[in-house]
């Protein structure tokens, strides 16, 4: 099979006095335009070239487009390049990418509701609260050992504190503020606790005296009836 390319060592003149035709054919042609233009009937592989030949302007335009593409370099797909003047192919790619990013952002906003809550419950799950142990709750509540912290629990007094308070109540049923502060410091109690204890103790004492008086009056009346 004969090669279409021409060798540089091929003789310029042919035997038999024929004129050289290599001067009309360039050895290094781009796009192979000149051989087809000057010799449309040249043989290729033992068969003649068809009468239909591409014009030279077609190859020149192709070479020009290729040279511009190589000189321009790779397309820049950055966001700022969207507003620049570029090759039509690069501009089209940047427009498509920009529209794709906007569609993704719009899709994300659609996934989240108007209240800002995501449609996926796994993302909105909160961390479990810390466990509450019995020793962390308030004691001495009215609803049992561990109850609500809204109401104040009943104060419990030790045996020593109760004995000292009873002694003081036996001598003085009403305390001055100075004496109340002294007893509170001595028994490691607050002034309010001392005040409440004496109030409750006086109410109890009044009830006891009332019962005693009622029993005495009822006993005297019975004795009077018997004597009559």
Swiss-Prot record:
Q: Which SUPFAM superfamilies match?
A: Homeodomain-like
Q: Which domain of life is it from?
A: Eukaryota
CDD domains found in the cross-reference section: homeodomain (cd00086)
Keyword Nucleus listed? The answer is yes
User: Gene3D superfamilies given for it?
Assistant: Homeodomain-like
Q: Could you tell me which species this protein originates from? A: Danio rerio (Zebrafish)
Where is the motif Antp-type hexapeptide annotated in this sequence? 132-137
Q: Which UniProt keywords apply?
A: Developmental protein, DNA-binding, Homeobox, Nucleus, Transcription, Transcription regulation
Q: Which protein are we looking at?
A: Homeobox protein Hox-B6a
| DNA-binding stretch(es), residue numbering of this chain | 150-209
Record's family?
Answer: Belongs to the Antp homeobox family.
Function of this protein? Answer: Sequence-specific transcription factor which is part of a developmental regulatory system that provides cells with specific positional identities on the anterior-posterior axis.
Question: GO CC annotations?
Answer: nucleus
**SMART domains reported for this sequence:** HOX (SM00389)
Localisation per UniProt entry: Nucleus
Under the GO molecular function aspect, what terms does this record hold?
Answer: DNA-binding transcription factor activity, RNA polymerase II-specific; RNA polymerase II cis-regulatory region sequence-specific DNA binding
Name a biological process GO annotation: anterior/posterior pattern specification
Q: What is its main location?
A: nucleus
């Amino acid at each position: 099979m004969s090669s279409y390319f021409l060798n540089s060592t091929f003789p310029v003149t042919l035997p038999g006095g024929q004129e050289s035709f290599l001067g009309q054919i360039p050895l290094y042609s781009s796009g192979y335009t000149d051989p087809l233009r000057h010799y449309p009937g040249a043989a290729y592989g033992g068969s003649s070239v068809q009468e239909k030949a591409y014009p030279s302007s077609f190859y020149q335009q192709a070479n020009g487009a290729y040279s511009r593409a190589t000189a321009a370099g790779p397309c820049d797909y950055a966001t700022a390049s969207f507003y620049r003047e570029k090759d039509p192919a690069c501009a089209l790619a940047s427009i498509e990418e920009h529209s794709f990013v906007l569609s993704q952002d719009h899709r994300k906003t659609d996934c989240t509701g108007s209240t800002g809550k995501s449609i996926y419950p796994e993302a909105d799950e909160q961390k479990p609260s810390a466990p509450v142990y019995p020793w962390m709750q308030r004691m001495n509540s009215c609803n049992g050992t561990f109850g609500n912290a809204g109401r104040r629990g009943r104060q419990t007094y030790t045996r020593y504190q109760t004995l000292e308070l009873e002694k003081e109540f036996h001598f003085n049923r009403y305390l001055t503020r100075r004496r109340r502060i002294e007893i509170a410091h001595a028994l490691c109690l607050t002034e309010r606790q001392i005040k409440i204890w004496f109030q409750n103790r006086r109410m109890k004492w009044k009830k006891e005296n009332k019962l005693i008086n009622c029993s005495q009056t009822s006993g005297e009346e019975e004795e009077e009836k018997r004597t009559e």
